[in-house]
Amino acid sequence: MQKINPNELNLTDKVVHISRVAKVVKGGRRFSFSALVVVGDGSGFVGYGLGKANEVPEAIRKGVEQAKKNLIKVPIVEGQTIPYEVLGHFGAGRVLIKPASAGTGVIAGGAARAVFESAGLHNVLSKCLGSNNPHNVVKAAFDGLKQLRSPDEIMARRGMAE
């Protein structure tokens, strides 16, 4: 698998979740922020990152930088969907991803929807099973998308001619 250069792609970012974290110290509470960000070019490349900082914009910037280092390629077939059904796991979170016919749209919960839209999937069904924490859902959706192989890749692996 070759390295993906994020500078060659026209990436857009979506903030999935921002959380305020409190550290209790002697004088009171110190607040910092973490931002879960998904980036994608809308044509098969997608990545996620978690940024942490004392200010929200800085946390988002760090999340985008990390997401660019964590890009994967998603095989998209005709009808702008995935080739077959897959189940992604992360911790207690599971995401079932199914291909859909043209015109269906993205039917997915908030965190998973951001991943699919950033990847450029326009017709896909998904269901979050188990944990619906945004961090677990995004990582489980990524696990599912990582498992996908294009039909050509599967045929080559099986030694079948096109």
UniProtKB/Swiss-Prot annotation:
GO terms for cellular component: small ribosomal subunit. One of its GO terms (molecular function) is structural constituent of ribosome. Residues 11-74 form the S5 DRBM domain. One of its GO terms (biological process) is translation. Keywords: Ribonucleoprotein, Ribosomal protein, RNA-binding, rRNA-binding. Part of the 30S ribosomal subunit. Contacts proteins S4 and S8. With S4 and S12 plays an important role in translational accuracy. Belongs to the universal ribosomal protein uS5 family. The N-terminal domain interacts with the head of the 30S subunit; the C-terminal domain interacts with the body and contacts protein S4. The interaction surface between S4 and S5 is involved in control of translational fidelity. This is Small ribosomal subunit protein uS5. It comes from Geobacter metallireducens (strain ATCC 53774 / DSM 7210 / GS-15).
